[in-house]
């Protein structure tokens, strides 16, 4: 299996992008430690608890937690919980579970931006006292008009020159709950003519009469992200505040707050390119829409781009970590091909997944010349290379093969079973198809075959049998359900639609096929949830985390054996 790279994997990175280090942050951190600027490093991962983590977050997790671990530092998990109307404890629990599942531990207790609400409020008051913040009564529509655009400077709010005393009074009344949601905001007084739109008197506080999952009903004013981010970093002693490139334009504002407040430290913000993966959606709003409108079963549906979805589908933490390392950390935006992620999981499972046989579309085979009542216990390796021991398959007169492995009128080059043709059963004997039994509608319901008793573990004398197919014994095999998952979207860019269209128009109608009545070899009867296997000739599968039970297994296809989508 050849390893795709940014050069030979389709769309792995932006075409023409210059060569960059695997992680441009490593030499920066090393230099800071060598110079004594920092004695140790502290990073943070600050998700907003308004949805489940997706594959894009995996890169941020691996960067922040990975660098901290590599350099002997710590990484904080801090929830940016400044918008109570959209946040939920369910998301907080899921995020913690996902970070741990990926193999990382945060330093100390879980932290919340809401832990610092009192301090942030005091700093907002400090900005008012310094004449650098004011209460504004403009409506959202008016504020948008006053803000200007990239070509035109903004205009000062008519409330910009309120006195310090009036601003302190109004802000105190905002905090006391005297005003309705949206009636007033607190804004920083910076520069309405700045070419950087983020510096045009940004909002610091909004009024939201909403119950907060951590602070209850203590607050009815909440700080926005930009006012919370840098100061929280300063409080926690973050040395390297690492975020994605869309926040590059926010860095001057990040620094402005730290420069104008009596903070205990002045962290430095660094930006790297976010993970853009084709055939996926990572907008939390759109992921939530998929769930709410029941296009998928839940946030952890194995077709979703959420980490819980990838986990349930059978992806391993190592495969996702290795994928994030493979694509590198740089400042060059591009689109990574899904085939790179699929390569990573195939590479991992090829080495770690035990082999097993499962017949997805069973066709009964009766070996007419095999002694009735006789059973042989055949030993097959659990892995062709790794020492995983053996599993035992009972071989007797009746067994199942896949319906797709027999054709009455096969095309040229067909190497499976056909009338009067021979094929080897994996790890067993060579059989010949003698007769196809059909029902009243002409459907094949059973094959009558004969076997060559001298072909166990060796080729028959004087003839070459090319085809090898998988099978399971009729007696002892376990009935199971198999879910064949594929990419949720049929377009590399699901966001690209016809005028007036929706990303939902690009949903792949063949993203899930549920097969019942499948037959698995006896060793799979006691498969535990999340046990992973290579079903020989079929793909990589795992026992479903929610629905699979010993004796009644449900298997999800993680990925096919080869890329079926092409380059």
Curated annotation (Swiss-Prot):
Predominant place of localization: cytoplasm
GO MF: ATP binding; glutamine-tRNA ligase activity
EC number per UniProt: 6.1.1.18
Short motif ('KMSKS' region): ranges: 281-285
Enzyme class: ligase
Domain of life: Bacteria
A Gene Ontology BP annotation from the UniProt entry: glutaminyl-tRNA aminoacylation
Name of the protein in its database record: Glutamine--tRNA ligase
Native species: Pseudomonas putida (strain ATCC 47054 / DSM 6125 / CFBP 8728 / NCIMB 11950 / KT2440)
Organism ancestry: Bacteria, Pseudomonadati, Pseudomonadota, Gammaproteobacteria, Pseudomonadales
Gene, per the UniProt record: glnS
